Amino acid sequence: MELFGVPIQTMYLYTLIIAGSLTLLFLFFGDVFSGLSEGIPFLNPTLVLSFFTCFSAGGYIGELVLPLSSLLIALLSCILSIMLVVLLHIFVLVPLSSAEESLAYREDDLRGRLGKVITAVPVDGFGEVVIEGIGGTISKSAVSFDNQQISYGTTVLVVDINNGVLSVTPHEPI
């Protein structure tokens, strides 16, 4: 079969090369076009480019391997591409969009958090406090803010941070 005087296999191959190249460009420079998909979520450029890439790859391979008509190969390729794009959307893009941007934290973010003493804090010395959160568990050196001993297992409140060392005080729940 020919389309615009060009064999359909060649059209599939050209589409594959162009869509694949645009997908790679969008992968590298996608932040520039980040606002394009906000209004209409199903027209996400990642999904559209993935559809054309899968469609043209499926059509090209189908034309080479399958002894079916070109129209049936295009239909099968379209159905396969829609299924792959839906799976990409559900299992990759939706979880990525709802994930936290980073698991990193700033030390200032620890101020006001509750932790638990895992190494007793002596009067004029260092102990260790563990702070649990959504992003994981953070273990930091600690000193007593009130210059008093804090025993193992005590729940503490982070008051200040100096040079990576937490200043903590025992926490009494209200």
Swiss-Prot record:
Which segments cross the bilayer?
16-36, 47-67, 72-92
Localisation per UniProt entry: Cell membrane; Membrane raft
Bilayer disposition of the protein = Multi-pass membrane protein
What do the Gene Ontology cellular component annotations say? membrane raft; plasma membrane
Consequence of gene disruption: Alters assembly of FloT membrane rafts; more diffuse rafts are seen. Double floA-nfeD2 deletion mutants are wild-type. No visible effect on FloT membrane assemblies.
Tell whether Nuclease is among the UniProt keywords. Answer: no
Its induction note reads: Expression is sigma W-dependent. Up-regulated by alkali shock and by infection with phage SPP1.
- Keyword set, alphabetical order: Cell membrane, Membrane, Transmembrane, Transmembrane helix
Cysteines paired by S-S bonds: none
- How far does the signal peptide extend, from start to end residue? none
- Report the function annotation for this chain: Plays a role in assembly of FloT membrane rafts, probably recruited to rafts by FloT.
UniProt family annotation? Belongs to the NfeD family.
Protein name per its UniProtKB record = Membrane protein NfeD2
Tell me the organism's taxonomic lineage.
Bacteria, Bacillati, Bacillota, Bacilli, Bacillales
